[in-house]
Amino acid sequence: MKKILILGVALLALAGCSKMLEDIRPKHAIPAETVTVDDLDKLTNGLLYQMENYAVSAWTDGDYLAENFSPGPGFDYADVHSDTEATSSATAKSRWQAAFTRINSQNEVLKTANGAAEGGEAVERAKGTALFCRAWTYFQLVIRFGNVPVLTESTMEIVPISPESKVWELIEADLLEAEKHLSAFTSYAYPSDEACWALLAKVYLWRGNRTEAINYADKVLANKAFQFKNTSNDYASLFINGTSNPELIFALSNLRNTSQLRIFEKMNDTDGSFNYSMETGLRSSLFADADVAGVSKSGDIRLQPTYNPAEDRRIIKFPNGGENMGQFISNPDASQSPIVIFRLSDIYLTKAEAQGNTSEGLATMKKYMDNRYETVTLPTTMSAADFRELVLDENQREFYAEGRRWFDIKRAYIQDKTFDLDKVYKTWNDRDYLMYWPIPQDERDLAGHDRYPQNPGYAE
């Protein structure tokens, strides 16, 4: 008997597993009852196709909520934090439902792969990719909501919310299992051992396990295929169609002929109707030369590929392929640009944050920053607070407009509750409970409030 998950939007899929399998294969509808080992590559690619949609839909969450944007020509807003303040938040509901729809598909592919009598590499890829994608999807959920249902198979039952710690345990277990089935890096377009280790390093960092965060970062760094490039053109090339930048560890290919996903439309659209511009204060400060707390840095290579004062309302990091719009680099096909998930900078900054204000942490930051500035000098010692600010600033510079900032701030707050959020955000107003998004009220009403308790601080 075919079973599926009852959870929010997944109620629409009660037609059975065949409908779900069609959903994960954009071009090749294969009836569930006839799926064979030969179909596994199509199913596996379907998971990555779904991951592309989720990544792009949630792309700006971390910048929007971190006050990194000002309204663009096609949008206006006031208090960004109110976007997730209500239990009826459309953003929270959308991220929740989209994630569990994908988890459903990941579970189905994993079930199919586990049931295959033979298949060799195709089965291994399917298992590894399904586990990796499920871990990544749950990572997106846990850093937003904390407590969420843990689903490792499709079910007709309503599964109660699990504590945040159990969600982290599933993510860790999935990644450790995924690396048994995946292979060493050969292309950034597919999950690999190194992609698993990159996410594991981040998971351990979030959980406060600094030793394992460093360990898995070092496992990635042991692969010398990943190399820094140190010019503005090199940095800009990370985000263009056809890139071969050796900093990339995992990036979704986004090679679609239909239903195209265009990150540039959010902040650099050719028709001038984009939603987001760089926050006005950041335009002069984000990539500025600095001499603070013994740190001296100048000539940030990321400035020109990200912001052009002549087109001051555009964020040009994701080139739109047009001309005469202040673009720094040409993009052969802007509609088929890669969706970058992990790159070498992730590993260095994760490792440095885990090492903290030690000589090792400063050495890691120096090696990283040498590849991002014309000149940089670091002191021999730094206070814990100053080092944290250095790492946060480098994350902000490196990953601006990639949806990271709010989550970096949240991680700093979780690890040190004396971290003053009101000094970071202009319109925070002591609403620390917003660090965890509300459980969507529609989902609670469907599942029952006892099964889906609301996060603290929100109205029941």
Regions from the language model: what does each represent?
Residues M1-G16:
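Sec-dependent bacterial lipoprotein signal peptides
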Residues C17-T60, L421-E460:
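Membrane-proximal, proline-rich intrinsically disordered regions
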Residues I30-T34, S57-G72, A184-K266, L378-A385:
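Short, surface-exposed recognition loops and adjoining beta-strand edges that mediate ligand/DNA contacts
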Residues D41, D76-F145, E157-P163, E179-T186, ...:
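Conserved, well-structured interaction surfaces
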Residues I103-Q106, W168, L175, A217, ...:
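Inward-facing hydrophobic residues that define packing positions of alpha-helical scaffold repeats
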Residues F287-L344:
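Flexible, polar/acidic helix-loop-strand segments at domain edges
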